[in-house]
Amino acid sequence: MRNKICDELNNTDIGKLVNLCGWVDRRRDHGGVIFIDLRDHSGFLQITINPDDGANLFKQAETLRNETVIMVSGIINERPKDSINKNLSTGKLELKVKDLQILNQIKNNLPFPVSIHDYENTKEELRLKYRYLDLRRGKLLKNLKTRHKIIKVAREFLDNFGFTEVETPLLTKSTPEGARDFLIPSRLSNGEFFALPQSPQLFKQLLMVGGLDKYYQIAKCFRDEDLRADRQPEFTQLDIEMSFISEEEIISFNESLIKKIWKEVLNINFDNAFPRMKWQAAMDNYGTDRPDTRYQMLLKDLGEVLGDIGFNIFTKAIKSGGSIKSITVKGGNSSISNVRIKPGGDIFQVAQDAGAGGLAFIRVKGDELETIGAIKNNLSEEHISDILRITEAEDGDLILLGAGDKQIVNQSLDRVRQYIAKDLNLIDTSKWNFLWVTDFPLFERNEEENRYEALHHPFCSPKNIKSKDSENLKKAIENSIANAYDLVLNGLELGGGSLRIHEANLQREVLKTVGLTDKEIDEKFGFLIEALEMGAPPHGGIAFGLDRITMLIIGADSIRETIAFPKNQQAKCLLTNAPSNVSESQLKELDIEITIDE
């Protein structure tokens, strides 16, 4: 049907007869001549139709509506100098139409303009419902091509290092991995269920037991969890696992992979090794294990200085084992008003939404500190000196403070730090600040349920566990650091991994520590324990979020912009109206009865 696409055309095609297919992006009538912007997947070309070219041809062109699918034949000409479009690669060319065929006419008015000129004015819910029209605009297609290139570069890199791509099952066993499973009822095994995998974690470990040595997969994963801008119920991981490998070797190899992707896709080189930070340092200084290091405002611990000044909130925080921390906003006296950091203000609300009761503040004015009386009246000169030294605050700076539970203080000041950095334009968006975060705790304590939870997952190996004595092993595990590592970019986790447990008794003990009984371990993970007893090699790996990598590379705000057919934030597909009801006969086949609470 066609012998060229728009973006292929150049000056060497002038005078040639070409056939093009595409959509009418816009039609304009000027001085008796019809100008049409023809759009295909590659770009645009202006085509012209003159009454002198034939009455029927001109009349047909007059009926064309935007998004009509057409095929045109004609001669490529050079545009007049006064009509050159410097914004297009084909902006110096136009097609003088000799023949026009309508391949498909649109039936009704479109729900939104497809033309790139109206791109920003369409609500996302409408874009998701008519995703095929949104794709046609070109921006999303470009995103998908970038995603394809990222995958292609990763595959070539891993292939060159002897990795084997293996597909692991999508219908598998429900195992506790943190989030809720999507369950699939089995028709043949009445009353039993498959689960869609939250990750290929256990299967890739079993591949190592099977001697594969080096594995990767572009893996679909599923988690039934609450959504946000960088989450989807189904998502894609670049999943990697290796045998006989150390933590240092995994970090070094995967750093090379990421550098290769950025080089090939963005033509950006990173000559130096990515910096590393231990988990505890990240929590102490940033309040999060995903720190954005493009700007300052580090958290500072003021517990020793302010814990005994007599201010009830501070005293209570320290006595209950909590903390008092601060961030310093340089020049904050002039850029942030009291209204914004008091109840009802936007910054106060950010802290409250993160779980904090509120924010205290200190304004530095020369040698004086301005704050509420309950704090100021109890500050000695030594207190003031210590505050200024620890916070590194100077005249004109604003100090914001949080007090209470350590986790909530960290979380709320982290959110406030991010919010203020965006609000005051403190972030250098041209920077790519990669960071390896290492030495995570193996567990975190869930005080409400009085039990331990794995910080990553219960298959991470603990560091420096030497004793195999059961009682000593239990104590050592509870206080252990994990052989785990995350790669963070500009405050977002790109990927995470660990060395895995490859000894059966150690794996059983770790699963017991997170609250499973021997019976539950055998029911849920018996196949893994059995495999580890049969000569499992030391192994480890990592999984990168492909959607998130693509989002950062293309500069989007949501991973929905990187996925062809994403769900909305209620986990619904607006295009197909899924999830949806199924017939009674389908439910009967599965022996499922649905009860709806009134």
UniProtKB/Swiss-Prot annotation:
Belongs to the class-II aminoacyl-tRNA synthetase family. Type 1 subfamily. L-aspartate binds at residues 177, 223, 456, 500. NCBIfam families: aspS_bact (TIGR00459), PRK00476.1 (NF001750). It comes from Prochlorococcus marinus (strain MIT 9312). The lineage of its organism: Bacteria, Bacillati, Cyanobacteriota, Cyanophyceae, Synechococcales. Aspartyl-tRNA synthetase with relaxed tRNA specificity since it is able to aspartylate not only its cognate tRNA(Asp) but also tRNA(Asn). Reaction proceeds in two steps: L-aspartate is first activated by ATP to form Asp-AMP and then transferred to the acceptor end of tRNA(Asp/Asn). Pfam families: GAD, tRNA-synt_2, tRNA_anti-codon. GO terms for biological process: aspartyl-tRNA aminoacylation. Homodimer. ATP binds at residues 223-225, 232, 493, 545-548. Its EC number is 6.1.1.23. It comes from the Bacteria. GO terms for cellular component: cytoplasm. The record marks 30 as: Important for tRNA non-discrimination. This is Aspartate--tRNA(Asp/Asn) ligase. HAMAP family: Asp_tRNA_synth_type1. It is found in: Cytoplasm. Keywords: Aminoacyl-tRNA synthetase, ATP-binding, Cytoplasm, Ligase, Nucleotide-binding, Protein biosynthesis. GO terms for molecular function: aspartate-tRNA ligase activity; aspartate-tRNA(Asn) ligase activity; ATP binding; nucleic acid binding.
